[in-house]
Amino acid sequence: IIIGVMAVIVIVGLGNGMTKSMRDSFSAMGTNTLSISIWGYGSRSASVEDVYDIAKENPDLLKAVSPQIDFSSNTPKVGTTTYRYSYVYGVDENYSALKNYTLAKGRSLQYMDIKDNKQVCVIGDFINRTAFGGNGVGQTIKLGAYKFRIVGVLSPKISDPTMQEGNDDDCIYLPYST
């Protein structure tokens, strides 16, 4: 009986330790975030304001929210060069913190950028290096008929410089309201 009780205690202890270890690992990877995709199908629709309302109604569950609107149909252009594989997202001032992005240069998007529909953006490292020789802050990038002033450059996310086109380092983030 004593051996059986000890075995159960050891098994429960190992299980609890493994659970904590897995939670810590997931938290370090940023998996304490939730992504909700809203598609234009069906009779129900949602807006960015709905997302903010849900966060206000559930402050104990949601610490921060940010919309991520896919604008990738707008192919970025710098001079005569088109960046066909770049992703373009409309986000708010919380997005960089939620994704654990750090800045290499400049600043993140700010509340006033969103409120005032400013034509500014933050770019990934790949675009900064290939389009601007590492000096993108203050330059402009064209999306459709609009020009956006680059206010920040993200630190590299991908360690292999040969594998950067079409990934996190090849993104452009602009105010979702623009």
Question: Where would I find each of the regions flagged by the language model?
Answer:
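Amphipathic, positively biased hydrophobic alpha-helical segments used for protein targeting
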Residues: 11, 15, 26-28, 117, ...
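Generic signal for short, ordered secondary-structure residues
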Residues: 5, 74-75, 158
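Short, strongly hydrophobic transmembrane alpha-helices
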Residues: 1-17
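Hydrophobic, regular-secondary-structure patches
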Residues: 15-87, 94-97, 111-112, 129
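Arginine/glycine-rich "motif VI" loop of SF2 helicases in the C-terminal RecA-like domain
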Residues: 4, 27-28, 142
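Hydrophobic secondary-structure segments that place a key small or acidic residue at a functional site
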Residues: 69, 81-178
